[in-house]
Amino acid sequence: MKFVFALLLLATTAHAATVPTGFTDTVVASGLNNPTAMALAPDGRIFVCQQGGALRVIKNGVLLATPFLTVTVDSSGERGLLGVALDPNFVSNQLIYVYYTATTPAIHNRISRFTASGDVALAGSETIIMELPNLSTATNHNGGAMHFGPDGNLYVAVGENANAANAQSLSTRLGKMLRMTSTGGVPPDNPFINQTTGANQTIWALGLRNPFTFSFQNGTGRMFINDVGQNTWEEINDGIAGSNYGWAICEGFCNPPNPSFRDPIFAYMNDAQTCAITGGAFYNPQAPQFPANFVGNYFFADFCGGWIRRLDPAAGNAVSDFATGISLPVDLQVSADGFLYYLARGAGSVNRIGFAAAGDNVAPTVAITNPANNAIVARKSNVTITATASDNVGVTRVDFFVNGTLQCSDTTAPYSCGWRVPNPMNRTYQIQARAFDAAGNNATATIQVRAN
């Protein structure tokens, strides 16, 4: 069974999913039109792709009226604006990458880079990184997910354009996982570099049907690839350089086993409710808030099933239910401060799941006492960030973030953290202090400062 975006455009009201006891689900923002993918920025903004070509920005819980950018796309079927990734050095270089179905000179998928100027793209900043092969009349199996790996290279999942033969051919980038430099170049250690030429040397793995999403695990660099099956099996594959995942010879586990192909680490059979594995994300944030047994788990979603489940690699890839009642989930992301975000296409919303143990749902109070909001701080200076925090059962720790990156944690009052101000001038930095209590409830204080 398959999903086609164009057939599923009936929006529902944004609402919270059903989550386990102790967890919370909150609507961050709604009003999105056919969203397809998202990326979390270090400063707390969320960039969301809309299939029709607009890249939207959610800032401080508000969907900004002006899109970050709008590209001209073919949005028929599963085509459109399908992927977004932030450069690893986004804080300093402000570079954002997108994957979209371009209309000229022929219909094909394109990877481009833009430069941010605040909450919009700098006019005229588009740089084309890669033009993918021209597409057939089939409008499905485009892939589109993009992430920078721990090696600093850009990984891009590309569908086989509904032509199974593409997946096994090294003469096309369709049906592949690609690996390229940030400028579209070929890393010298790519696995098929001596078997291909030109842009096909970016092929990193093959035998994929429609790899809709994938995720890297923080700390280990392990990659899981979610590959949408045809009629029977939805796959989670271990992303390993040079692998052939078997499509279209195999769907799910090869039967009989075939040593030429890498079987999935987990596959589930479609039923009357499920149709396509979509979002996927490892839970390894800098500051976890979920219970310890969730850390290292891989969360994944099914588009038609409307659920999120979790796979535990440390327990033999055992799978457990987690959240239900989501309207067409398409993407999952984990933030540095330990929230699990999901993108609900049917509801046009971004939600986040947090944890607050049963029995105590009173959040701490927290305030940043230094520096002052909107203060000017000297470049390359050492600033001590201080905060006060209190709670009905006691504060266990305060985490300090600058532009979404954890700087340090303090478990003893008065709570403080040292921060070295970077060199660029006229740069705005968001500082957050997040206080936790023993039940996992948390609250955040936010200020901003400018370096000069």
PLM segments and residue spans:
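Acidic, Gly/Ser/Thr-rich repeat motifs that build Ca2+-stabilized beta-propeller blades
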Residues: 17-165, 213-229, 273-316, 339-354
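Beta-propeller blade signature
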Residues: 111-118, 172-182
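Long, low-complexity serine/threonine/glycine- and acidic-rich segments characteristic of extracellular
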Residues: 359-452
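Short beta-strand-to-coil "C-cap" segments at the C-terminal boundary of structured domains/repeats
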Residues: 180-182, 351-358, 450-452
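Surface-exposed loop and turn segments in beta-propeller and other repeat-based domains
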Residues: 67-77, 125-139, 183-204, 247-272
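Conserved blade-ending motifs and adjacent loop-strand segments that build the rim/top face
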Residues: 317-335
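Sec-dependent, cleavable N-terminal signal peptides
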Residues: 1-17
